[in-house]
Amino acid sequence: MRTRSQAIIDDRLLIDFPADTYAHYLKWNIPLDKIKACIITHSHSDHLYPAEIQMRSAGFAHINSVKPQTFYAAESGYNMLADAVKKYNISENDINLKLIKPFESFETEGYVITPIKATHDEKSSPVIYAIKKDEKSLLYANDTSELCEESMACLKALERP
């Protein structure tokens, strides 16, 4: 059976948060209580289903961590997540939101992550990710067509292990 797009790296970094997140947890025993960072590729519902974040709230989840899960998303996804936090009255102790911009690298959980502009529905603020940790790197690129010149230049300029 096909489910919606999601990936996990080292049981620490989650990529995308679709409605199937809980199903993925059940089927593959994803340690959702240990994941502290989630990067969002774009705001289409098969990659981001903001209503699902309320399941991290008290009454639904029993997470023995004092550190909230941080979601990193470009403008459209960030706005959808912020709306869900307000709508479901989610505490800052459960969720932390970070607005990212294409081509501006950031660090989280030991990874250096570079969001790169994807070619997809512009309203969804699409990005692909170059992810690096220690001497390993990964390009996570889906739901994109041919990349623009700026994105190709960014990829070529990235340091390779």
Which ranges hold each PLM region?
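Active-site metal-binding motif and surrounding structural segment of the metallo-beta-lactamase
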Residues: R12, P18-T70
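A short helix-to-beta-strand connector/capping loop
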Residues: K67-P68, I90-N96, E109
